[in-house]
A protein has these predicted regions:
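Membrane-embedded alpha-helical bundles of multi-pass transporters/translocases
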Residues: 1-579
Length: 579
């Protein structure tokens, strides 16, 4: 991985890590204020989710696929500032129109995603309406952030979400101080003031996250002035990409509705068919918690690497330097796979300690209901992460068709497996099947994805090195999982925990200690296997971290960093301060 991409990935990852920490504090305060069950908690989760779902549709179809590649191309033109002002103005106009339209449609959207009591529906509609402006600010954040990323200014872009979380924490803190815990309060308790302190302050935080980016935007020499018009900014050639990309997220959201409805109905169906308590069956809450933990390494590492590499690959392709783009893509895929395979092993071997360490307020019984879908999701983590980088590469080629084909196949597998499971398996297994379906849907069609990608690189995407790297990481992952699973019960006994099939005892300290010990075990096995197999990516990743994290090592005197082939690549850190 090149020096600039490695540095920028670490900047993005550090910002994401800080965002996750403050976000976890926000989650704790949210649970304190509204609880984790009951109509208020469910209504708030739905209200905050719906605008993000709508924005995902927009970001996939317009911003990530169209505007970001055009930003890279525009920066090379003589009248870059004029064209960028047009792009920003176009984005603002589209976002304002969409936000207003979705605000009007809020009651219909709530009925589509929420299946609950009249109280839940009414409060969810109010929360959703307060959160709707987030669509505008998320979009603005993406556009301005990618301009900064294209200019190698990552710090504010990476860290602004921390400010959003802090503002939301202040809102929840004020709510708790003024009104206490609202888990069992009636519907008439929820006045506009109380809704504003919860949903409103979160929207205010997202607004800060976007608007603060105008400060570094000015520092790089671009002073935004509204300028209407689309002539000369190259959007015509990107129209098909937008259409294909919108199709991707459209199919994805259809499957998301299927997942949500199946997961929500699982406890009720188990109670109805098997006469079980709904509290003993994994449902939507179990799945959402598993998916949130699964997304931690994905958002911290995969998204950071993809965000950092995208402008670089786009620039190489715009310059018709296919060899440079191939080298960057190969390096990113090989290094990313090595890292994500380790996290996959961790999710398979120690899901329970991870869950109890991150969610100390839940019981072992609840954690066990989350652990199985988390392990199932972990199986597909490496390839789902790789797809993100490959998707961005297709977009750099102005190609939205091939990512759509892959995702259409993926979503068909997911939807088909999930729906079939509701007919042939008991409701107690539905959530695990959802996790497995997601993993399998990325694994089975992955060879087709690489075949389609190969056509963009003159028939060669550095296949031999990538396949070799993936195979070595897979062998190391299997070895780490086998040894880790053999040691797991012994580690539980060592720390004093007792885990049965459906329940057990493990406090927070025991969970943390178990997680540390099992992580050490799988890390030793994983790294030893990679070393024995002479995986060149191991040297690359460790060298990149050692050169940039204080106490782990020193940077090469030449100012470069070791690339996967052992050569030194000149650092670009001295090219300017990062904003």
């Amino acid at each position: 991985m090149s020096s600039s991409v490695g540095r920028n990935s670490l900047i993005m990852a550090s910002g994401t890590a800080a965002s996750r920490v403050t976000g976890q504090i926000r989650t704790i305060l949210l649970a304190w204020a509204l609880g984790t069950t009951g109509y208020a908690a469910n209504a708030y989760q739905a209200g905050s989710m719906i605008p993000q779902v709508i924005y995902t549709l927009v970001s996939g179809g317009i911003f990530n696929a169209v505007l970001v590649p055009q930003i890279v191309r525009t920066l090379k033109s003589k009248d870059a500032e004029t064209k960028l002002n047009k792009l920003i103005t176009l984005a603002i106009t589209l976002l304002l129109g969409l936000t207003l339209l979705m605000a009007v449609a809020t009651p219909l959207l709530t009925k589509l995603y929420v299946n609950g009591s009249a109280e839940t529906m009414a409060l969810a509609t109010s929360f959703t309406l307060w959160c709707m402006p987030q669509i505008f600010f998320y979009g603005l954040y993406t556009v301005i952030g990618q301009i900064l990323a294209a200019k190698d200014h990552f710090v504010t872009y990476a860290w602004s979400s921390v400010g959003a979380n802090i503002i939301s924490c202040i809102g929840f803190g004020a709510f708790i101080a003024m009104f206490g815990r609202a888990t069992e309060r009636p519907l008439d308790f929820w006045t506009p003031t109380k809704i504003a302190l919860t949903a409103g302050t979160w929207t205010l935080g997202v607004a800060f996250q976007a608007l603060v980016l105008f400060i570094p935007l000015t520092r790089i020499g671009l002073k935004y002035r509204p300028k209407f018009g689309v002539h000369g900014i190259g959007l015509r050639s990107m129209g098909p990409v937008a259409a294909w990309s919108l199709g991707i997220v459209g199919v994805d959201q259809i499957v998301n509705i299927i997942v949500t409805r199946v997961a929500t109905s699982a406890p009720f169906k188990a109670s109805e068919q098997l006469h079980m308590s709904q509290l003993d069956v994994a449902g939507n809450a179990s799945y959402q918690n598993a998916y949130t933990i699964y997304m931690l390494p994905y958002s911290l590492i995969a998204v950071s690497i993809a965000t950092a590499i995208f402008p670089k690959i786009s620039k190489a392709i715009a310059d018709r330097n296919i060899d440079e783009a191939r080298k960057d893509l190969s390096s990113a895929l090989r290094n990313l796979n090595l890292i994500m395979c380790f996290f996959a092993a961790a999710f398979i071997v120690l899901p329970l300690p991870i869950i109890l360490a991150l969610l100390p307020s839940i019981s072992v019984r609840e954690a066990l209901l989350i652990s199985t879908p988390l392990a199932a999701l972990g199986i597909g983590l490496p390839l789902s992460s790789s797809y993100l980088v490959i998707q961005r590469t297709f977009y750099a080629f102005e190609d939205g068709k091939h990512p759509f084909i892959f995702m259409a196949i993926t979503m068909t597998i997911q939807g088909g497996v999930i729906i079939a499971s509701t007919f042939i398996l008991p409701p107690t297994q539905w959530i695990t099947v959802i996790g497995l379906a997601i993993s399998v849907s990325f694994i089975l069609p992955y060879p087709l994805l690489t075949h389609m990608l190969r056509s963009r690189f003159d028939g060669d995407v550095d296949d031999k090195r990538i396949i070799t790297a993936y195979a070595k990481a897979l062998v190391a992952t299997i070895a780490a999982c086998v040894i880790g699973l053999l040691c797991r019960n012994g580690v539980y006994r060592l720390v004093g925990a007792h885990i049965g099939p459906d329940d057990g005892t493990m406090n927070w300290g025991q969970a943390v200690l178990s997680a540390i010990l099992l992580t050490i075990v799988i890390a030793i096995v994983y790294l030893a296997c990679l070393w024995a197999l002479r995986a060149e990516e191991l040297t690359s990743v460790v060298g990149m971290l050692a050169a940039r994290i204080p106490g782990l090592g020193n940077k090469p005197k030449s100012g470069g960093t070791a690339s996967p082939n052992g050569k030194l690549e000149q650092s670009t850190a001295e090219n300017g301060d990062q904003e």
